[in-house]
């Protein structure tokens, strides 16, 4: 059993990564959860008594996914203010969370049953760098087959423009340009031709479905 201290610590760890990724709203939210969580709700008790390894199990993401679902559904105005950054003081965030856990306990608890699927186009930058290395060694024509493609955003990689420290790859008129933080010399950009992209997932998501 992980123990309460370790389970709270998972939210501190998530807060650290949120700060590193310039996501201060989520960082404040995670810190408030870690500090203010109690057993006064079934959801709170389930998190504090989590029997698995909370970081590996993505416990913070499971709970925050549930909170975000409430915001998207328009179910709680104060929580929406936390997510938008209008409410940004730790004590105020803890107060909102305590009430939300009481008012929406039944809606939040099922979100702990499984980790959320996260879709972030920026992850395609690392994939493209790998594809460039393959193209340089084996030639430009590549096929992508992704296992666990979720909403399929990586499968749109041939439609994104990438800027790697000033070295560009992808359509110049692409509607999305991904510019990761780059240190050092820009990479070589060999010819690359992605001729097909395919993916599979046990629970595929439709990203156009709000």
Stretches found by the model and what they are:
Residues 49, 53, 73-102, 118, ...:
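Class I S-adenosyl-L-methionine-dependent methyltransferase module
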Residues 128-132:
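Short, well-ordered alpha-helical packing segments
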Residues 1-106, 110, 114-117, 121, ...:
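A short N-terminal interaction module
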């Amino acid at each position: 059993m992980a123990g309460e201290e370790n389970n709270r610590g998972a939210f501190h760890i998530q807060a650290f990564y949120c700060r590193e990724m310039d996501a201060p709203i989520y960082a404040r939210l995670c810190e408030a959860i870690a500090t203010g969580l109690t057993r006064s709700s079934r959801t709170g008790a389930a998190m504090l008594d989590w029997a698995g390894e909370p970081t590996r199990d993505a416990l913070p993401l499971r709970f925050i996914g549930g909170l975000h679902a409430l915001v998207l559904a328009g179910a709680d105005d104060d929580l929406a203010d936390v997510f938008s950054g209008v409410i940004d003081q730790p004590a105020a965030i803890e107060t909102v969370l305590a009430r939300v856990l009481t008012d929406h306990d039944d809606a939040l608890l099922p979100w702990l049953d499984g980790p959320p699927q996260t879709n972030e186009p920026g992850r395609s930058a690392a994939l493209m760098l790998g594809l460039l290395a393959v193209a340089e060694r084996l030639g430009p024509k590549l096929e992508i087959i992704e296992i666990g493609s979720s909403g399929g955003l990586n499968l749109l990689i041939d439609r994104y423009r990438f800027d790697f420290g000033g070295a560009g790859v992808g359509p110049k008129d692409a509607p999305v340009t991904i510019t990761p933080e780059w240190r050092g010399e820009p990479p070589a950009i060999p010819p690359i031709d992605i001729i097909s992209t395919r993916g599979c997932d046990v629970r595929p998501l439709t990203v156009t479905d709000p």
